[in-house]
C-alpha cells in the first residue's frame, strides 16, 4: 500500500536508488497504489553516472510491497520491502536490468518487458 510521501527502493539499474512518491495515478482522489500501479515520484538518492539524477520527477510502476496482494485463489504474496521500477511514457523500463523478484500481477497490467527482464516472477 503505497501512498503520497512513501519511499520506495528502485529495482533497476537506471541510476536511482530511492524514490519519494508524489502522486498515485489513476483516478482523481486515489490514495493508495498496489503492485502493478503507476506512481509519479521524485528521485531522492541516485548513483553517479546514472540515467536519472537526484531531483528528477519520474514515473514508476510498483513491483513489490510489504502489504502484499491477494490472489484470486485466496493466497497472498508479500515482500520484505517496497520497490518500484522507473518507466518511460510507453510503459517500458528506463533501465536495462531488474533486480530482485517481481509479482505475477505485473503480467496482468501489461508490463511484459519488466516481467521478462526480472530474474524471478513470484
From Swiss-Prot:
Q: What is the lineage of its organism?
A: Bacteria, Bacillati, Bacillota, Bacilli, Bacillales
**UniProt entry tagged with the keyword Zinc:** no
Its quaternary organisation is: Part of the 50S ribosomal subunit. Forms a cluster with proteins L3 and L19. In the 70S ribosome, L14 and L19 interact and together make contacts with the 16S rRNA in bridges B5 and B8.
Which family does the record assign?
Answer: Belongs to the universal ribosomal protein uL14 family.
This protein is called Large ribosomal subunit protein uL14
The reply to whether RNA-binding figures as a keyword in the UniProt entry is: yes
Which cysteines are disulphide-bonded?
none
Q: Can you provide one Gene Ontology molecular function annotated for this UniProt record?
A: large ribosomal subunit rRNA binding
Q: Which SUPFAM superfamilies match?
A: Ribosomal protein L14
Q: Which InterPro entries match?
A: Ribosomal_uL14, Ribosomal_uL14_bac-type, Ribosomal_uL14_CS, Ribosomal_uL14_sf
Question: PROSITE patterns annotated for this entry?
Answer: RIBOSOMAL_L14 (PS00049)
Matching entries from Pfam families are given as: Ribosomal_L14
Q: State the organism named in the record.
A: Bacillus mycoides (strain KBAB4)
